[in-house]
Amino acid sequence: GYPVNDGFCCIKGLSLDKQQTVVKTSPLPKIRQADGSMKEVSWDEGFQYVADQLQELQAKYGRESVAGISTGQLTMEGFAIFGHVMRNYLKTNVDGNTRLCMATAVVAHKQSYGFDAPGYTLKDLELSDTIIFIGANPVVAHPILWKRVRQNPDKKVIVIDPRKSETAMNADYWYPVKCRGDLYLLYTLANVLIEKGWIDQNYIEAHTEGYGEFKEFVKPFTLDQAQETAGLSPEQILELAQLIHEGKRVSFWWTMGVNQGYEAVRTAQAIINLALMTGNIGRPGTGANSITGQCNAMGSRSYSNTAVLYAGGDFTNPARRAKVAEALGVDESVLAEKPTATYNQIIEGINEGRIKGLWILCTNPRHSWTNNETFASAVKKLELFVVQDIYDTIESAEECT
């Protein structure tokens, strides 16, 4: 079957026709008129209007007076063209709504591995003998992924989650960690694994650095204190540590329960450290694997639809800049020389009058931004607000120009 869904259709997609999601929008673009009404125009006229407005704003206020907010919902080709237009033609700021769900994982990946990319495929769920979900509920949130789990005939499913979620109900083991207790639990697990010698010393020496400092760091995280802080008994934590030790192909999976949680980056790094110290990384059925919330959040980072260089690199890294410029066939001077504005900085820039034009793509910040009243006040200050979406009924579309 197809490598992503293996021929399985997600129940969410199959149910769309039974929900209030029928696209009733006209296939033509619309431009707001002086009286506030929206007028349909041809695609050629719509394209020309947006292009002229963007160029006029940049000529009047400067290159960074316009910005874009992207999504995690496009194809790779869509991300590639949007990234190229914003980065290499308009040479301005663009970030994605994927920051709201994946910034934690991005930072953890870069600090742990040196680059932003989890090293796994969905096939690993079928090959792992010990599958550990942390702050994830794939039964509901990722049905296709869960189907892979069910196809695995030889696995133990472990869930670490304060809630007895649908996934916890289908698991072999459920550990109801206290809210805000997951980081302490993970550090305690690391300490237990080290004390019992349940680590892969050869892998650690060959592929990691800083192990000695990490070993000293986790020593204060004890079983007795974990019972109070993490809400799990010493027996439960020892059982979990033994399950990790006995597994031959252990995989750790996390999503928004970690990424939008307390000390999220540290928690994600702690998960990665467990995989590294036990040698459960880089082999089929293993890994510390961040599950994205949107279908192509990785694509947004790969094609610079977020505030990073192409392929999730840093704008200040000379080696990465040279490789990206070569791959794109452009002069290196075309690439931005500093980190560009993030989602929150774009909203701040609008409210402060520095950004005059905004182009959003398949996202609805008027509804989903963390403090959407700040966005509501911001859009009223824009001279140009372009909303690109299949639905003209979303809240952001009601504010567009």
Indicate where each model-derived feature is located.
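N-terminal export/assembly segments and adjacent metallocofactor-ligating motifs
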Residues: 1-196, 210, 214, 233, ...
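Flexible, glycine/charged-enriched surface loops at secondary-structure junctions
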Residues: 61-65, 199-204, 251, 282-289
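Conserved short loop/turn motifs at secondary-structure junctions
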Residues: 67-75, 228-232, 255-262, 294, ...
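Short, conserved loop/helix-junction motifs that constitute active-site signature segments
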Residues: 149-154, 278, 376-381, 398
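A glycine-rich, hydrophobic/aromatic-adjacent loop/helix-cap motif
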Residues: 244-348
